[in-house]
């Protein structure tokens, strides 16, 4: 991986986290927010880039989490490269998706300006739904890491419209992080093994460990299984 500019300047490193949604109940958004919190505690500065609107963006309440934890953020428009598996495959649809790629390249120019202004050393792309961060990182010669959290077809009924193009961008990343062995096994068929690594989501023990709470004391145990 390219040596970060912050360490070369003898300054604190700064990471830009590229979100694909703005949803306080989204697992991916929560994981990214927790990552920002942990990085800040380690004296690594962070900024978050959230999309303006779109089919996968959500209700727009993710910013409340960022404000609560005093995480600096920017709203930058972007368009996902992911579509539903039943999305039409015809000339008009393909032309529309090509138009979105061109628009994302324009949006990436604005993001590149933010990366330069903020003196960002590393770009972290939070899901496979967003890819314009890769354009911006390459434009200003900043290394980027890509987090894969989704199977897509198997768990969400979605897919890349241009899979080969998306895998090409992902293969150019300095690191691709799979959150499980199963995710790794799916994507390593299309991505270079030397850029992929399995890193499980961290758990804040203090958030879940409640020794003072008494459970399983009643004679009848009632369980609710959801999913």
Regions found by a protein language model. Name each.
Residues 15-18, 216-227:
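Conserved donor-binding/catalytic core segment of Leloir-type glycosyltransferases
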Residues 123, 172-181:
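A short beta-strand/loop micro-motif in the catalytic core of glycosyltransferases
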Residues 19-25, 38-98, 183:
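N-terminal strand-loop element at the rim of the active site
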Residues 15-16, 134-154, 177:
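Active-site proximal beta-strand in glycosyltransferases
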Residues 182, 202:
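Carbohydrate-associated surface elements
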Residues 114-120:
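Glycine-rich phosphate-binding loop signature in dinucleotide/nucleotide-binding domains
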Residues 56, 104, 108, 122-140:
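An aromatic- and histidine-rich active-site surface loop
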Residues 106-107, 132, 143, 150-172, ...:
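Nucleotide-sugar donor phosphate/pyrophosphate-binding loop at the beta->alpha transition
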């Amino acid at each position: 991986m390219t040596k970060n500019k912050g360490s070369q300047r003898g300054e604190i490193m700064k990471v830009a986290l590229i979100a694909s949604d703005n949803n306080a109940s989204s697992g991916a958004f929560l994981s990214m927010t927790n990552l920002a919190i942990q990085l800040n505690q380690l004296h690594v500065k962070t900024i978050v880039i959230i999309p303006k609107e779109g089919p996968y963006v959500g209700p727009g309440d993710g910013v409340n989490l960022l404000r609560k934890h005093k995480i600096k953020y920017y709203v930058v428009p972007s368009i996902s490269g992911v579509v539903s598996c039943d999305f039409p495959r015809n000339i008009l649809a393909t032309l529309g998706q090509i138009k979105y790629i061109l628009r994302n390249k324009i949006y990436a120019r604005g993001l590149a300006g933010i990366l330069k202004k903020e003196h960002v050393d590393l770009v972290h792309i939070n899901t496979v739904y967003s890819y314009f961060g890769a354009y911006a990182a390459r434009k200003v010669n900043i290394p980027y890491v890509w987090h894969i959290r989704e199977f897509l077809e198997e768990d969400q009924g979605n897919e890349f419209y241009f899979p080969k193009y998306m895998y090409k961008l992902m293969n150019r990343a300095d690191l691709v992080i799979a959150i499980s062995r199963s995710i790794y096994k799916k994507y390593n068929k299309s991505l270079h093994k030397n850029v992929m690594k399995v890193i499980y989501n961290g758990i804040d023990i203090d958030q879940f460990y409640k020794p003072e709470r008494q459970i399983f004391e009643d004679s009848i145990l009632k369980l609710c299984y959801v999913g």
